[in-house]
């Protein structure tokens, strides 16, 4: 499958842009505990996790996209699968960390 003139790169760009915007928005929303107060000691650490994950996601997605273009793999399916796996891993990690405190 040739990617020139294909709609897949546009879907990939849209998915990356949407994911980036959501990560930036979510990184500035502090986690609230059951008491309704944000734990002050965890907010900077939590923010750094979100921003580092965003950087990791973007760099990996770019290199992953380049590999897909090289081997003519459908970018739409592969990018969404990769993003889904990364997001699931992050949610599990964050929930484990916050509940262990």
Swiss-Prot record:
Signal peptide: 1-27
Compartment(s) of residence: Cytoplasm; Nucleus membrane
Keyword field contains Transmembrane: yes
GO cellular component terms, A-Z: cytosol; nuclear membrane; nucleus
Keyword Membrane: yes
Keywords: Cytoplasm, Membrane, Nucleus, Signal, Transmembrane, Transmembrane helix
Topology within the bilayer: Multi-pass membrane protein
TM helices/strands, residue ranges: 42-64, 79-98
Protein name: Uncharacterized membrane protein C27F1.10
């Amino acid at each position: 499958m040739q990617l020139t003139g294909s709609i897949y790169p546009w879907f990939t760009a849209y998915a990356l842009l949407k994911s980036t915007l959501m990560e930036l928005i979510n990184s500035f929303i502090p986690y609230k505990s059951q008491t309704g107060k944000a734990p002050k000691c965890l907010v900077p650490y939590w923010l750094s996790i979100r921003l580092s994950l965003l950087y990791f996601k973007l760099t990996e997605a770019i290199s992953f996209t380049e590999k897909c273009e090289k081997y003519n793999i459908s970018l739409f399916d592969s990018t969404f699968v990769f993003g889904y796996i990364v997001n699931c891993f992050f949610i599990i990690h964050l929930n484990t960390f916050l509940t262990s405190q």
